[in-house]
Structure formats: structure tokens, C-alpha cells
Amino acid sequence: HYLIKKGKVVNKMGLEEYKGVYIYAQQVDNKLSDIAFELVGKAKELAADLNTEVTAVLLGSNVKALATELGEYGADKVIVVDNPALETYRTEPYAQALVSVINEYKPEIMLVGATAIGRDLGPTVSARVKTGLTADCTKLEIGDFPINAMPGQEQKHNQLLMTRPAFGGNTIATIACPDNRPQMATVR
């Protein structure tokens, strides 16, 4: 796809260029957090519905050994960004690293744990890659959006449907991000 703007041809990113279900594999003190394994499991379910792969993104310093553990739990691929600046969690270096991975590899879905770190990292990253983020999801599934399309309304298929509590937990909302990639969520 190309966009012609004032005589210049600008490459326009098509949604079909985004592939795979990615998870941020949180580690603290070079030990993987439980949420990393939980996200790999959920990502495997979503990836099966989309006929794609699960990629774990591991950020830190001297963390390469943890990649094997993620593979044993079901990640098809592990991208390791190993840098002394990532020894302990700080928003800016971690956000820069995750944004660069997203920009290079173009995941269709990016899941982050709804931990203190994930609640800081997720919104920062989603803003920088210009996509939405659904926070504190309790259910994720692949489906059509809008769920109950009106006659004549276009329905998009294979969307990430993200369910979360709304209005103080009195109701639930199912949210989709049909026009932007990656589809991002923090997951409880």
C-alpha cells in the first residue's frame, strides 16, 4: 500500500503486515515473573485461533538463559534485548526497547501483564506506537467485530476481543482495536 501525499509516495503500513502474538516476558532480578508464563499460555490459545506463532519479548541484562525457560513453556520464539541499561526496570529504557521491537517485528497482538511494571510500560509503549491499549483485561478471545453488526455495517474478522470490568466493576466491556496494530492489552 502506498499513500501519495503532495507528489511524494509514502509507504503506508497495511494491517496485514502485522503478524504473531507477542508477550512481554516480565523478569525481576533475572527471574521470570509468573505472569510471563501465564501470558505464554494465553498467547498460545490466541495464536492457535489465528494460525500464527507466539513470541516472547525478554528485556534485561544477562537474561539470555531465561529464553530457554520461555521456550519450554510454549513460546515459539524469544526476542532477547540484553543491555546493561535494562538491569533494573525503568520506564524510559524499557519503553524504548519494547517500542523498537514492535517497530521492527510488527506484532499483530502485544500482551503485557497487569502488574505494577506492566501498568507503567503498556500505556507508554502503546502511545509511542500509536495504538490503543485495553487495560486490566480478564478475558481475551479472537472473534468478529462489531460482535453484532448492523445490516450493511462492515464486520472485521479475526480481531482480538478484550473484555474488562467497567463502571466500577458493575458491568463488563468488550473492546476491539480494529484499525490499529498492534492490538495491545494488559492482562490480569
Predicted regions and their residues:
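N-terminal glycine-rich FAD/FM-binding segment characteristic of electron-transfer flavoproteins
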Residues: 1-188
